[in-house]
C-alpha cells in the first residue's frame, strides 16, 4: 500500500476509534458514575502507554517534564472527567459535535496565548468546520430541546483543554518523539 493510501486508511481507523468513544462513554455511564468512568479511561490509557512507551521515558529531559505534565493534565485528565459528566445530561452526538470546536479553539488560543502563526488555508478550514459545527448544533438543539445544554459548556471546556494541549506540544515539545510525549 502506498504511503498516501496508508495515511487515509489510518485516518479512517482513527476516526472510527475516536468517534465511537462518545457512544462508549454514554454506554459506560449506565453502570458507572462519571468519576469512575473518567478514572477508568485514564487508567487504561496510562497502562497501555506505559507498556508501549516505557523505554522512551528516559529520553525526556527534566525541563520537558513540566510541559509533559501540563499536556497530560489538559490533554487527558481534565477532558476525561468533563466528557463523562457532560454526557449524563446531553447526547453523545451533541458531545462529539461540540468536540469538533477543538480546531477553532486551537487556532484562537495558538494565536492569542502562544504567539503561533497559522496559514490562510488552515484558517479557512477552521471557518468551514465552524459553520458545519454550528449547523449541526442548531439542528440538535431543535430536535432535542429536553436536554440540559448547560452541560454542553463542559464539552466546550474540554475542547479548550485539548486546544491548550495541542498548542503546548507545538510550542514546547515539537522536537520530541510523539511516543515520549504521550507516555
Where are these regions (language model features)?
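Glycine-/small-residue-enriched transmembrane alpha-helix faces in small-molecule transporters
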Residues: 1-36, 144-171
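Cytoplasmic-side transmembrane-helix entry/capping segments in multi-pass membrane proteins
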Residues: 11-12, 63-73, 118-131, 151-152, ...
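Specific transmembrane alpha-helical segments of multi-pass solute transporters/efflux pumps
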Residues: 16-22, 50-99, 135
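Juxtamembrane C-cap of transmembrane helices in multi-pass membrane transport proteins
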Residues: 21-32, 44, 80-90, 98, ...
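Transmembrane alpha-helices of multi-pass small-molecule transport proteins
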Residues: 31-78, 105-109, 161-165, 182-183
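Specific alpha-helical transmembrane segments that line the substrate/conduction pathway
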Residues: 36-47, 83-117, 122-123, 158
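Hydrophobic transmembrane alpha-helices of multi-pass small-molecule transport proteins
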Residues: 49, 69, 109, 118-140, ...
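Membrane-interface helix-boundary motifs at transmembrane edges
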Residues: 56-63, 112-121, 143, 167-180
